[in-house]
């Protein structure tokens, strides 16, 4: 198995915060794989450090490519390239790699699913002054589980429902200064339900 990161486990290791899934549980599962004979080489990116052709030359005969979730999606609004913005996957990965990170100021998380909630709760643990979640959906239709929502509120994180991002305003250094939201009356078209 070739893993481009320094530790195996993919999203289990780098995408799920340790307050939800302790890393020693993942490590134990990986040890079982090793005991079964799986040889794991970390820090090797297929297509960059090795190629399918070079692996064939080494004697590999079959390939299973499981690249997982490699990135996130920005909302396509003006200013989203401002310094200080991040997609969820990168934020959670960086938080796992560098646990000494301290967030200064306020953090806004856009989204209403469990991954957005993970980002908000992680930001709170990294000492953000204030964490606010903005979700298109109303509270009863948020994709996040009710338990996740309640735990988020218990941690003092504000959830604002029915808002979508319109624009990120940058300061003179290209950093996020503020984010402008628009009120969302309905997520789905009442006629087509799309």
Predicted features, each with a name:
Residues 24-73, 86-97, 103, 126-194:
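A Rossmann-like FAD-binding core segment of flavoenzymes
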Residues 75-79:
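Conserved catalytic-core motifs of eukaryotic protein kinase domains, centered on the activation segment
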């Amino acid at each position: 198995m070739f893993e481009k990161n320094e530790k195996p486990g993919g999203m289990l290791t780098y995408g799920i915060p340790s307050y939800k899934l302790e890393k020693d549980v993942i490590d134990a599962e990986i040890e079982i794989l090793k005991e079964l004979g799986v040889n794991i080489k970390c820090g090797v990116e297929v297509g960059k450090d090795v190629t399918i052709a070079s692996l064939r030359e080494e004697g590999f005969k079959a390939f299973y490519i499981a690249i997982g979730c490699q990135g996130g999606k920005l909302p396509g609004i003006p200013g989203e390239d401002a310094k200080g913005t991040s997609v969820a996957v990168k934020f959670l990965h960086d938080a796992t790699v560098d646990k000494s990170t301290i967030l200064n100021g306020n953090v806004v998380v856009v989204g209403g699913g469990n991954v957005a909630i993970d980002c908000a709760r992680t930001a709170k643990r990294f000492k953000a002054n204030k964490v606010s979640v903005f979700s298109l959906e109303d509270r009863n239709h948020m994709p996040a589980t009710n338990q996740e929502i309640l735990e988020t509120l218990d941690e003092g994180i504000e959830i604002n429902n029915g808002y979508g991002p319109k624009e990120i305003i940058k300061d003179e250094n290209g950093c996020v200064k503020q984010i402008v939201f628009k009120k969302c009356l309905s997520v789905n078209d009442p006629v087509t339900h799309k």
